[in-house]
């Protein structure tokens, strides 16, 4: 949570900040005569606590929000983002032979008659060759086997995880924050994430039942819509991606057609349009707070369970921020720091005014008697006389 509010992503950075800040020492109950925990201690404590404990912390914060009427839970939105893993692409090896990527490229060069290439020649050959594909079925990272080869939004390829938020569209509270493999399609994880959100609402004793679920067109899949329509109480509001041809339902179950058409009608309605506007605003805001200013865009841990633990606490810290904004009108990452800076600036301004006043009226060398305004003095005297 300190990492979220201070905008620090690494364990070493968090440990250093706890050691350096007097206010954080006071908050954590660490006297100046004692050393604060180092990054190794933080890692050991996190590893010893199971992920269920971290989920209990998350639901405990949800319970606090519910006490302040900050959890509605009826209308939610779902979206995902990629978290860059703590592993480089050069750490990948083939699953079948165990060869690293450089040796694999050298074998391709040998087939074309190029022997004993230098590292620069290998890099140039790999950059120029056509149909270059690296799949998770054939390659795995030795540094973090659970990280997936993922194409990022900027077109680059990295080892990554996928973080998915389920957000209350009425209060901006995160109801679930789940970590999945980076190569999982959005439609694969939609129902699981919403079910996690409902479980969290139940464990937080909110009494809320999720009814409406909004997502972007990346979540649209016929099979997923059909499954959710058949065995869940959720109504989906998911726009359809543009297709080159009209959908054909010949030979397909009637349930699929009914589910797709019902979702289409809801999306085109006024409520559907409003939910899409709210989704693009509220869900993206949670990612901006947690991943960008909160320091969670790149994970410094390895293994899905460790990443899940850290991300649950970051999402819980975001929800504490929602509560703080309700109570104190501040609660974003670095928000308290800005408040302190503003307070210090105001105090400094008051101090400068005090010094100026002191020099003007107390210091004899700078004392300058002001001329008497007789008309103003006479008017003041007349007003006192009239009052008497």
Identify the residue ranges that each predicted region occupies:
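Short, amphipathic alpha-helical "recognition" segments used to contact nucleic acids or chromatin
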Residues: 1-5
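Anion-binding and metal-coordination hotspots
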Residues: 7-20, 30-388
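Short amphipathic alpha-helical interface patches used for protein-protein assembly/oligomerization
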Residues: 24-28
